[in-house]
Swiss-Prot record:
Its EC number is 2.7.8.7. It is found in: Cytoplasm. Gene3D superfamilies: 4'-phosphopantetheinyl transferase domain. This is Holo-[acyl-carrier-protein] synthase. Mg(2+) binds at D8, E59. The lineage of its organism: Bacteria, Bacillati, Bacillota, Bacilli, Bacillales. Transfers the 4'-phosphopantetheine moiety from coenzyme A to a Ser of acyl-carrier-protein.
Length: 119
């Protein structure tokens, strides 16, 4: 059964400006696993796209959960990783999480569907 659907769209330049002013933004938004992947990118633009995509995914996830970010769930509570085929995944107790992330030159977007787990 579907618990919720969340969508988020963000301008990549907005993240670029925030990152240039606040390098600690990476630590605030990304988990340790995500930070490792972020730091392995060699091109600065790819780093910004990755950060924007993960930001959008976490916003979309919190919307699907119905709580928003803050009191009940924080950026660092949500670890988005890629499976062996490259598909984005999030593990969250009690839910099956479906994630889609896309980028254009100017925008990153994500859609998350939360399905209640039968277990």
């Amino acid at each position: 059964m579907i618990h919720g659907i969340g969508v988020d769209l963000i301008e990549i330049d907005r993240i670029k400006v925030l990152y240039s002013k606040q390098p600690k933004l990476v630590e605030r938004i990304l988990t340790k696993n995500e930070q490792h992947k972020f730091n392995n990118f060699t091109h600065e633009q790819r780093k910004i796209e990755f950060l924007a995509g993960r930001f959008a995914t976490k916003e979309a996830f919190s919307k699907a959960l119905g709580t928003g970010l803050g009191k009940h769930v924080a950026f660092n509570d949500i670890d988005c990783y890629n499976d062996e085929l490259g598909k984005p995944k999030i593990d969250y107790e009690g839910f099956i999480v479906h994630v889609s992330i896309s980028h254009t030159e100017h925008y990153a977007m994500s859609q998350v569907v939360l399905e209640k787990s039968a277990f």
